[in-house]
Amino acid sequence: MLIIELLKAIFFGIIEGITEWLPVSSTGHLILVQEFIRLNQDKAFIEMFNIVIQLGAIIAVMLIYFERLNPFQPGKTAREVQLTWQLWLKVVIACIPSILIAVPLDNWFEAHFYFMVPIAIALIVYGIAFIWIEKRNAQQEPAVTELARMSYKTAFFIGCFQVLSIVPGTSRSGATILGAIILGTSRTVAADFTFFLAIPTMFGYSGLKAVKFFLDGHHLDFAQVLILLVASLTAFVVSLLAIRFLTDYVKKHDFTIFGKYRIVLGSLLLIYSFFKFVF
C-alpha cells in the first residue's frame, strides 16, 4: 500500500535529517535501518533514494545560511562581500579531491563496502578517532577560530578528509569535522565549513546518482516520485532542527559523545552480523 510506503519515507527522512549533520553517517544509518525496514521498491530505486533524499537536508542549510552565503545580500559591506566570495572559493577548492578521487571510485566502493561489516568497522574506527582527537586537543587552543582566517590550503586538506566518506559508515560531516579539528580549527569553524561544503558536494553527488539512475534505463512512477518528495521534505524539516542543535552544541561541548555512540553502535552491528552469519 502506498500509505505504508509513505510512512516509511517519513521515517527514512527523519533518519536522514538527523544523521546527515551529526558525525554518525547518514548513508550508513539508512543502509542499517533498511536491513529491518525496507521500501517495497527495486534495488536501483533504493540506492538512488538513499542519496537523493539528501537534497532536502541541503536546502535546509541553504535556507539557514542564505544571508551569510549570498554575496549579493543587500546591506553587506564591500569587505563582507569579499569574504563571502573567499568562502565560496575555499568551498570550491575543498571539492577538488572528491571530484578527482571519490567520483571515479564511487561505483567500486558501492559494490564492495555497502554491507553491514564495513559500516560497523568504519563506525568504530572513526569513533575511536573522535575520542582520541578530542583528548589530544583538550589542553590546546585552536589556531583558527574564524572561518575568514582559514587558509585555502587548509580548505583543500579538509576536502581530502571528505574523500574518506566514500566508505559507508564514515560520515561525510564526521570526516570533514575531524579533519578540520586535526588541521587546527575550532569546533565551530569545523562545523560551519562542513555545512557549507555539503552544498556543492551533496548536490553534485545526488545529481550524479539521479543521472546514473535514468541512464541505466530506469524510470520513476508516480508512487516513487511521491516517496522521494515526502522523504526529502521530512529530511528538510528535521535538518532545520538538527543543524540548530549541532551549532549550539559545539559551542559548549566536544564530539566525544558521538565517538562513544559510534563505537557502541558499530560493536552491536558486528555482533548482529556474526549471529546472522552463524545462524
From Swiss-Prot:
Output this protein's name. Answer: Undecaprenyl-diphosphatase
Q: Which GO terms describe its biological process?
A: cell wall organization; peptidoglycan biosynthetic process; regulation of cell shape; response to antibiotic
Name the principal localization, coarsely classed.
Answer: membrane
Q: Which PANTHER family match?
A: UNDECAPRENYL-DIPHOSPHATASE
This entry carries the following GO cellular component terms, namely: plasma membrane
**Which Pfam families does the UniProt entry name for this protein?**
BacA
What Gene Ontology terms describe what this protein does at the molecular function level? undecaprenyl-diphosphatase activity
Q: What is its EC number?
A: 3.6.1.27
Lineage, top-rank taxon, reads Bacteria
Report the locations given in the UniProt record.
Cell membrane
- Keywords (A to Z) from UniProt: Antibiotic resistance, Cell membrane, Cell shape, Cell wall biogenesis/degradation, Hydrolase, Membrane, Peptidoglycan synthesis, Transmembrane, Transmembrane helix
Family in the record: Belongs to the UppP family.
Chain segments annotated as coiled-coil in the UniProt record: none
